[in-house]
Design a protein with these regions (language model features):
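Core catalytic lobe of class I
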Residues: 1-248
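C-terminal helical cap(s) of enzyme catalytic domains, especially alpha/beta-barrels
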Residues: 246, 250-256
């Protein structure tokens, strides 16, 4: 299969065409069963889970033994997906909470929805993770400025902050595209319903792959994974069954 191309293809059919154990990193933003679009609507939760498990079964064989996998979804659906991945022998690494900063679907009957889950799994205990490549600024600038001069005492040892910032934790405070692009307080419409922030996809690509590695996305949408991979010197294999999204993704790639 030709690399660095976005295929107009159904996810499962696409995955069956990918060579076994060829993928270093898979970043998957699949349907959530939220009924907000035709591609995200299922007759029942059982039908949704059957579909989800089907593409997972097709995905696992294409991951290298050292490969990594990120899957977006709701916390509720992620609980099922996590259990299924564990049963399939993948190694759980993190349950990442993405704080979207947008307070979507505010309710007075329960806590406001403002997050999504990102499951981070690996094919085995041997995998790529470039922690230093994704460091972020320390939260307390004044405290860090003081620590850089004389250090901070932790467990009886003198600690000095890393000049490149702190390590990334399991809660990611990254504004959603709908939140970042509000005009006059109003959410703008996107060509794709749920685009993911480039900053977030870049973090995954930098952390869990190296230059020239192969990154896969079988629900490519507007092509953010492909754009990130190309920009950061990785190869990619992506697919989406919507021709409009494929055209949009290719247009974004042409701009690089």
């Amino acid at each position: 299969m030709e690399r660095n191309k976005i295929y107009k293809e159904d996810a499962i059919k696409f995955l069956t065409s990918v060579a076994e154990k060829s993928v270093d990193l898979a970043i998957i933003d699949p349907p959530y069963n939220m009924s907000k679009a035709e591609w995200d609507t299922f007759k029942s939760q059982n039908e949704f889970l059957k579909f989800t498990y089907h593409w997972i079964d097709a995905l696992i064989p294409v991951l290298k033994d050292t490969g990594s996998l990120y899957i977006f979804n709701t916390p509720f659906n992620s609980a099922y997906i996590l259990q299924y991945l564990v049963e399939k022998g993948l190694v759980f690494q993190n349950w990442v909470t993405w704080d979207k900063r947008d307070g979507f679907n505010a309710s007075k009957n329960r806590y406001t929805h403002g997050q999504e889950t990102i499951l981070f799994f690996t094919r085995s205990k041997k995998y790529t993770f470039n922690a230093d490549a994704i460091r972020i600024p320390y939260q307390s600038a004044s405290r860090i400025e003081s620590a850089q001069k004389k250090g901070i005492l932790k467990n009886g040892k003198r600690w000095f902050p890393n000049p490149n910032g702190r390590l990334v934790g399991e809660v990611w405070h990254i504004a959603s595209e709908r939140h970042k692009n509000k005009i006059g307080g109003k959410t703008q419409k996107f060509e794709h319903l749920t685009p993911k922030p480039m900053e977030m996809i870049d973090r995954m690509v930098l952390a869990s792959s190296n230059k020239a590695d192969l990154v896969l996305d079988c629900f490519a949408g507007s092509g953010t994974t492909a754009v990130s991979a190309k920009k950061l010197g990785r190869n990619f294999l992506c697919a989406d069954n919507n021709p409009q999204y494929v055209a949009l993704a290719n247009a974004r790639l042409m701009e690089l």
